[in-house]
């Protein structure tokens, strides 16, 4: 088997672009992604302007978003038919009241081409409540399947492996690409793996170790965000 074409896909919770922006930009530029799937993109006043500025600082273009998730692309790279959807967070009973655990979330994805093969990239950010996350994941997976393509799903899952979200992803037949990648949170002393990269059957991929990427330093990783990124390489093999 010989190596075929590849795509570099960066999944990164950028903490609302509120930490050391220069450090964050150095990390992203060193990773040199074709696509950056962002969680906690800047929002509220001047949302689009901020996201375009953030993308420009990374050397990328802002092309699609839903809630606080965004997709950025490198020059010469396209995202076809982006799909955005709200992820509604259920009400839970707190004593005598029903309250929402968080504001509605979102997921965003799109079709891309790898070596003439269509696939989908999807990014999400699940909530803090364990029951809510399961309900949210149902909605995310429904969106993933609506592409009718093999897909890569990445995001901040707010849960460690062994929890119901991870179990559900495994039951769907998805491959956990980060199983050997190590913890992703907190960036200055990572002890929890709460960020995921899951691949559907029909695709091949791996997470590139951060310490193997020239220009990525521990200091910049700790300063740029509270999460560590995951750089995924998707490949097709030819005989």
Where are these regions (language model features)?
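Metal-dependent phosphoester-hydrolase catalytic domains
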Residues: 77, 82-84, 145-150, 159-239
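N-terminal, active-site-proximal structural segment of metallo-dependent hydrolase catalytic domains
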Residues: 1-57, 70, 138, 236-239
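His/acidic metal-ligating clusters that form di-metal
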Residues: 109-113, 118-120, 134-157, 165-166
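Structured beta-strand-rich core segments of catalytic domains in phosphoester-bond hydrolases
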Residues: 35, 40-118, 210-214
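Active-site neighborhood of phospho(di)ester-bond hydrolases with catalytic His/Asp-centered motifs
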Residues: 36-39, 64-66, 152-156, 176-179, ...
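Alpha-helical elements of Rossmann-like donor-binding domains used by nucleotide-donor carbohydrate transfer enzymes
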Residues: 23-27, 53, 135-142, 164, ...
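Active-site metal-binding loops of divalent metal-dependent hydrolases
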Residues: 14, 41, 124-126, 155-157, ...
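Active-site environment of divalent metal-dependent phosphoester hydrolases
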Residues: 17-20, 42-47, 129-132, 157-164, ...
